[in-house]
């Protein structure tokens, strides 16, 4: 919905009631995800509900989860903002064999997940629209948006055909002239919260910075997490070196 200053709201309504979305991004539970037992999925979803989460964002650099995950999210009342599994890259939509596989994937997953109450929205990918508008200077910017046929045609048609009550947007973040704008749509707030101005990839850890994010809907942000102490100890001789 458009506001008086020209910006736009971004929010979810359930049964006509506007809700507050609190949650986090869901990434694969294990680097070998097939070894994650069903009980672990329930534990993780239950812990999210206990923390008053109302939504997980299914990160497009991960994987589609097994049926039990969607069953637990529906049972515990956690909605899903669900990326299709494409992330941070351009995809060869000029190749018919690739488009065929993309269409099969979209058809299968939208049919498989259509009946789960937890499905709040499908999003086409993780950060690919933003990458095209923001990540590449003119000399190396691709001549066109590779993947457009997938995100603007194949996926939305599959969603509308197989799950017509679930909305679709082509990417996350999305909306606005540059995809990741704080005045419109959802935002991935990585560059705002304290990146050191003179060192491109050095982060300044300021918790207070999260209070200053001017986003309509922050669908991804956070801090880099440290590994467990055992991992550190494998790389250091003694605990005193930590």
Describe every region a protein language model picked out.
Residues 1-89, 99-121:
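Active-site-adjacent substrate/metal-binding segments within catalytic domains
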Residues 21-22, 226-228:
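Short helix/loop capping segments that flank catalytic or ligand/cofactor-binding pockets
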Residues 62-63, 86-88, 126-130, 175-176, ...:
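Solvent-exposed loop/turn segments at secondary-structure junctions
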Residues 99-105, 112-177:
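Active-site neighborhood of glycoside hydrolase catalytic domains
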Residues 173-211, 226:
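Substrate-binding cleft/loops of secretory-pathway carbohydrate-active enzymes
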Residues 218-222:
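Short acidic/histidine-rich active-site segments
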Residues 231, 235-238:
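Conserved small/polar residues in nucleotide/adenosyl-binding loops
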């Amino acid at each position: 919905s458009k506001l008086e200053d020209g910006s736009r709201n971004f929010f979810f309504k359930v049964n006509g009631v506007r809700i507050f979305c609190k949650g986090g991004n869901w990434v694969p539970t294990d680097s070998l995800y097939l070894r994650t037992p069903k009980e672990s999925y329930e534990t993780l979803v239950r812990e999210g509900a206990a923390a008053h989460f109302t939504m997980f964002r299914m990160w497009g650099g991960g994987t589609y989860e097994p049926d039990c995950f969607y069953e637990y999210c529906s049972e515990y009342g956690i909605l899903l903002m669900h990326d299709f599994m494409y992330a941070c890259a351009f995809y060869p939509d000029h190749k018919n064999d690739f488009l065929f596989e993309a269409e099969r994937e979209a058809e299968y997953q939208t049919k498989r997940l259509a009946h789960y109450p937890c499905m709040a929205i499908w999003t086409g990918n993780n950060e690919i629209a933003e990458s095209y508008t923001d990540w590449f200077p003119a000399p190396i910017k691709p001549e066109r948006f590779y993947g457009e046929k997938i995100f603007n045609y194949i996926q939305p048609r599959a969603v509308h055909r197989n799950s017509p009550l679930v909305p679709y947007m082509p990417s996350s973040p999305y909306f606005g002239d540059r995809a990741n704008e704080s005045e419109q749509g959802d935002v991935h707030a990585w560059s705002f919260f304290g990146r050191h101005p003179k060192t491109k990839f050095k982060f300044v850890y300021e918790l207070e910075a999260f209070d200053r994010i001017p986003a309509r809907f922050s669908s991804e942000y956070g801090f880099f997490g440290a590994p467990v102490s055992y991992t550190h100890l494998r790389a250091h001789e003694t605990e005193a070196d930590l």
